[in-house]
Every structure is written in C-alpha cells, then in structure tokens.
C-alpha cells in the first residue's frame, strides 16, 4: 500500500497542521484566564492561500441548464448508415466510442428541484477519432421558439421577476400567449411528459434539423431520436411537487445510484431522413423547431445504442466544466439553416468562454483526447495549460514546421445543395393555420391514454390560477386555438380552484 499524500500549500510546501494560523500573543499580565490572542499576520501564506482560493471557488453557473447530472459511457454502432453519413465513428457495425452525457433542467438555478415542470437537457459528447462531436438535445422533440432573437426574452420570462426575485406566472404566460408558435411545446410541457420520473426514463430528441452527408457528398436532412430502453415514465404533478420538497436532487441521485450498482441505463439511437425535394412538399418549413416530422412519412431508422456505465470522479471537474456546443461537429455532419440552431453555433461557445475562459477546450473533459488537436493560431490566453505548442510558429507556416491538412469532403453528388437568392431582409416568422395543427394532433395523442388530457388541463389551471384574470383569459384563448374544448376545460378548472380558495375551510 502506497504512503498517503502529504498535505501542502498550493505551492507544494508541506504543512504540519492545516488549522493553525500565525498570530502575536497579547501581554498576559492581569488576565485571570488564558489571555486573548493578538492579530493575524499578513505573512501567513497558508491562511492567505486557503482563503484566497476559497474566495474564487465558484464560477458563473450556466444561464440555462444550470442544474444537471452526468455520466460517462460508450456508444456502439448497431446498423450500417454509411449511405447517409460518412462520419468515421459510424463507419463500422460494432465500433465503439467513449461518450459523456449530461442531463439537466432548463430554467432553474443550480439548487433548484430536479422534478420541476421544465424541459430536460440531454447533451452527449462523443470522443471520436475526428475530434469531439456534441449532440446537444432536449427530452422534447420541439421547442418554444423558431426566431432565435426571442430566446433571451423567453428565458427571462421563465426565470425570476427582476423586482420581486420570484417566479412570476404573469410574465410566464404573457410571453407564451403572445407567441402562438410556442403552443405545441407548452402542451407537451404541461402534460405529464413535462415532469419525467428520472433522467433514465426519458427520451432525447435533436429537435433541430441537421444535414448529414455520405462519402459521395450526397446529403439528407436528419433528425435524431434517443429512445430509452428503460421505458418512458413520468410523474404526476402531485408526485413531482412532493419530491421537490422531500428529495430535490431525486433525478441526480437516481442516475448516480443506478450506475453505482451496475444498473446501466441505455438508449437506442434512430434517425429520420428527408431529401431536399421532400422538404419542398412539406406544409411547414423543415427548419421550424416547433414542428415534428410525421413518422409515417419519415420512419425511424436504427443506427446505434449508447450505455452510461461510469460515474464522474469529480462533479465540478467533469459535469460542471463540460462544455457542449452544436458547433462541435465532425466530417459527415453539419448544421442546417434552422435559424435557432445557427444562433446556438455562436451562443454556446460564447457562453463557455465567459463561464470557463477562452481555453475551455483544454479542460480534460473537453479535450479531443482521441484525435488530439493542433492549431498554431489558437495560442496564449488565460489558463493556457497545454504547453502552448512550445516554440511552434504561431501561424500556418511552411518554413520550418510543415502542416498536414485534411482532405476536403467531396462536392455534392446527384443531390443539389440549397440555393440562396435575393436581398437581405428583416425576417419574423408569421403564424399560419398549421401552427395549430400539430398541437391539435398532440391533444388527440394524449387522449389515447386515460387521464393524460385531464392532467394537462389540471396542470395548466394550477399554474395559471396565480396569474391576473386578464392573463388567464388570454390563456384560455391560446389553448382554444388548438381545440376549443381545451380552453373551456382550463377555464372551468380555474374557476373551481377559485371557489375552493374562497370557501371557508372546515376545522
């Protein structure tokens, strides 16, 4: 057995007692008992070293997805999809790639409850031979917005009122009812699917449309689905509320304990594909994040499985400091023109640079350890700890440091790329009747399972009953655009709650 480590200062100086401080005794004359000890000394490096580091322990929490849990695992290719994608990590059935997945809530702070009614983040980093690939998904196949500039507005309404610092139902519903494209996601959120029973028992969806291309340069639009082998299980509103009080870290604990005892969660991986010509025949834009692709027209195709089988050794170093971005991609995959996705390509690395520093890619959990990295331009900056490429010239030079470059992917084959014409215009997505069609279909899907429609009505009513009456009226109208009966049922439920609140309680 090796000797235990020696306690030291940050500079490696051995410490005999971690709790002593340097002080000057007072003159003990006249003191009946032990005299008080005098002032501290600024020269006490051990004390200053300890306190100054403690003062800087916290970094900014994520502006969204602050509360999360993660684990390492392995992805395995189960089916050949090289006709669709030329990414090397997908080129052979049976091939395995190390991954890290982080689950999270969206709107809450780091100390908030895991069971809050909120979408769940579902982000996975693949450590591939062509660099790191990040698939930054949610547990819902759609989202609240499709105009990216609305994102800060939307998120502010889901957080705290700037005056009261309280969650504000008026803010929450004021924004949503003024932006009808949110209806599909809001119905999903206020169904029981808005409160997953655990991170292990929920699916993951790309939501966005991506473009994948094969070795010939032929490309298709793609949506990705992760389907939980544990099944999908949700909480009723009452259960979620109870757990928020009794065990606010319920989902974090559930994931950790399952992996610790060898009950490894896994997900099957599927894609939907669509050609450019097929996209032109859709009743909605292929780049609309508030819509799903009908499975009967675009069936699921299996391509892999991933299993989470290793808990992090240190939450801060790994789960907290891991940095995901949809711009972290590999050859064979690229973003589409989905405007919300395009905005995330900038925003995610930008917030990492703010939160973790410009060299966040050097943090071990973010390093492309399998492929390595070499870019003589990216040098220096705060916390550059990788050797800074030594004396290598800091430009692409052919003089004394020849560099190899990757082979460019082949140009498109028989499938043409999108064509862009016209002038730059200010664009704001306009609502159409189809914006209410998929919410209407979702209401019918809920009707296939007893109690699901009733849960949606009750969950909305419980939330909006705290809002002002004119906001409530807007909520009834909002849901009625999907199906008039939904607005009527919510109105009746809110009125019932008001009567109960106003009636004298019996002792």
UniProtKB/Swiss-Prot annotation:
Subcellular location: Peroxisome matrix
Residue window of motif Microbody targeting signal: 505-507
List of residues binding heme: 348
Domain of life: Eukaryota
Signal peptide: none
Metal-binding is among the record's keywords: yes
Keywords: Heme, Hydrogen peroxide, Iron, Metal-binding, Oxidoreductase, Peroxidase, Peroxisome
Reported cofactor(s): heme
SMART domains: Catalase
Record-linked Gene3D superfamilies: Catalase core domain
Active site (catalytic residues): 65, 138
Principal EC category: oxidoreductase
SUPFAM superfamilies referenced in this protein's UniProt entry, alphabetically: Heme-dependent catalase-like
MF-aspect GO terms: catalase activity; heme binding; metal ion binding
Reaction catalyzed: 2 H2O2 = O2 + 2 H2O
Enzyme Commission no: 1.11.1.6
Alphabetical GO biological process terms: hydrogen peroxide catabolic process; response to hydrogen peroxide
One annotated Gene Ontology cellular component of this protein: peroxisomal matrix
Free-text function comment from the UniProt entry: Catalyzes the degradation of hydrogen peroxide (H(2)O(2)) generated by peroxisomal oxidases to water and oxygen, thereby protecting cells from the toxic effects of hydrogen peroxide.
Family in the record: Belongs to the catalase family.
Record text on subunit structure and interactions: Homotetramer.
Record protein name field: Peroxisomal catalase
Organism: Pichia angusta (Yeast)
